[in-house]
């Protein structure tokens, strides 16, 4: 049941489970953290009621026991214990959301918000990249609390998203060759607070992204380089490293 298009695998650290999107099977596969070899998933969310069609990425909220799936003009939310042909417990979507092509999502369970990496459509049909920030439990046709978008934002083909709650920061891979970092309080046409990579950097087509705050590290996988790169950025993670040193 595994395939080549699973770009947003996530891990539920509270339950020690690996949660995997399966685009071709229109399914979510949940494996035990200890799974190895040809192992069956412990649960599979799949079927006509799920509304899953072409999922590429997902995100796990371990604190509240939920799975978030960006699916085009909507974000589907499932219970982590769901199994079989089950409907989402919430669906975020509609004209008021401002997006038509959601590709990634991340959850901040501390602030009770989600960040959706998406595009809106301009009057002439162009895609307008954005990071839309919603209440975590938002459902239906609702407006975002804030939207980062515009020329100064430098958003372009957003990949995976990670949130660092302690610092109030959101990290995104930009597949044009860099990682961008904003404050979760940013709104409108604002530039990133920090960037990793760029025109003279090593990154070419970053996809995967993770954070290791204890070691001040931003970890990026690059499709073009076929490599995983680790950047030390203590200026971003000072609060947690200072506390750990006490």
How does the language model describe each region?
Residues 1, 39-47, 86-94, 142-150, ...:
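Beta-propeller fold detector
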Residues 1-15, 48-64, 96-111, 119-122, ...:
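Beta-rich, blade/repeat-based domains predominating
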Residues 11-13, 19-26, 60-62, 67-73, ...:
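Conserved beta-strand positions in repeat-built beta-propeller and related beta-rich domains
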Residues 15-16, 41-42, 65, 88-89, ...:
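Intrinsic low-complexity tandem-repeat regions in disordered proteins
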Residues 25-27, 39, 72-74, 86, ...:
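A detector of repeated loop/turn-to-beta-strand junctions in beta-rich toroidal repeat architectures
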Residues 31-38, 77-85, 133-141, 181-190, ...:
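Short loop/turn segments immediately following beta-strands, especially the blade-tip
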Residues 205-246:
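Blade-level signature of beta-propeller repeat domains, shared across WD40, Kelch, NHL, RCC1
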């Amino acid at each position: 049941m595994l395939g080549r298009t699973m770009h947003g695998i996530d891990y539920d650290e509270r339950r020690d489970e690996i949660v995997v999107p399966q685009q071709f099977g229109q399914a979510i596969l949940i494996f035990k953290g200890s799974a190895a070899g040809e192992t069956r998933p412990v649960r599979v969310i799949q079927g006509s009621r799920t509304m899953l069609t072409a999922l590429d990425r997902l995100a796990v909220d371990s604190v509240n026991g939920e799975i978030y799936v960006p699916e085009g003009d909507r974000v589907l939310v499932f219970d982590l214990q769901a199994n079989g042909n089950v409907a989402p417990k919430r669906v975020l979507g509609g004209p008021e959301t401002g997006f038509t092509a959601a590709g990634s999502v991340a959850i901040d369970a501390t602030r009770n918000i989600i960040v959706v990496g998406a595009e809106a459509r301009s009057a002439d049909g162009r895609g307008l990249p954005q990071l839309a920030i919603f209440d975590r439990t938002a459902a239906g046709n609702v407006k975002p609390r804030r939207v980062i978008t515009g020329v100064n934002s430098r958003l372009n083909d957003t990949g995976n998203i990670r949130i660092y709650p302690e610092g109030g920061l959101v990290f995104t891979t930009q597949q044009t060759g860099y990682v961008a970092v904003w404050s979760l309080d940013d709104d409108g046409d604002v530039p990133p607070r920090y960037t990793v990579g760029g025109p003279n950097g090593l990154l070419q087509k970053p996809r995967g992204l993770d954070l290791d705050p204890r070691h001040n590290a931003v970890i990026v996988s690059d499709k073009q380089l076929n490599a995983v790169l680790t950047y030390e950025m203590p200026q971003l993670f000072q609060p947690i490293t200072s506390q750990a040193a006490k």
